[in-house]
From Swiss-Prot:
Database matches in InterPro entries: RNA_pol_sigma-70_dom, RNA_pol_sigma_r3/r4-like, WH-like_DNA-bd_sf
GO molecular function, one term: DNA-binding transcription factor activity
Name of the protein in question: Uncharacterized protein MG428 homolog
Gene Ontology terms: biological process: DNA-templated transcription initiation
SUPFAM superfamilies reported in the protein's UniProt record: Sigma3 and sigma4 domains of RNA polymerase sigma factors (SSF88659)
Length: 172
């Protein structure tokens, strides 16, 4: 089911940012829209009317930054999980709240990442996931870790598939 976006300006902004900088990540239209909605929600918290701007103008001026930072924070959360923290710390950080902001911290997400990790044969192949979320391209990852590009593509596709399961489940 497609997400609906009611703020046309924000939708266009999200599309523009997607085509300029996120094409290589293979995000779906729904994922872009959900990042845009998250950014809009974020920007409402930071908006201060005392400066005389309407929220629409403020969003137009700062929307791109909010969308980028929302995506960056999403990827940082993923990177934190991939950073091989000890299990006790992961348990302490776990939350029961399945809001779009918190679902990445759920046990379910950790299990999905572990399923993807099981496909990796060694520590170098596990590093593929960490480099991918940091924005490295497939070829760069292959050269850096001395793996074939085919193997890198395979591991990344598995990782994306597991993330998409959660994305569909939580709508973010």
């Amino acid at each position: 089911m497609k997400l609906q976006i009611f703020n046309t300006k924000l939708g266009l902004l999200a599309a523009k940012i997607y085509w300029k900088s996120w094409r290589h990540l293979g995000l779906s239209e729904d994922e872009i829209v959900s990042i845009a909605l998250h950014a809009e929600h974020d920007s409402k918290k930071r908006y201060d009317p005392k400066y005389g701007l309407s929220f629409e103008t403020y969003l137009k001026l700062n929307g791109a930054n909010f969308i980028k930072s929302s995506y960056r924070s999403l990827m940082n959360k993923v990177d934190d999980w991939i950073g091989f923290k000890d299990m006790k710390t992961l348990e302490e950080q776990n939350t029961v709240s399945y809001t779009p902001e918190n679902y990445l911290r759920s046990v379910e997400f950790r299990e999905m990442v572990h399923l993807a990790f099981k496909k990796a044969k060694n520590e170098d192949e596990r590093q593929v996931f960490a480099l991918y979320v940091k924005g490295y391209k497939n070829l760069e990852i292959a050269k850096k870790l001395n793996l074939t590009t085919r193997r890198v593509r395979y591991l990344i596709s598995i990782f994306k598939d597991h993330i998409k399961v959660l994305t569909k489940r939580y709508g973010y």
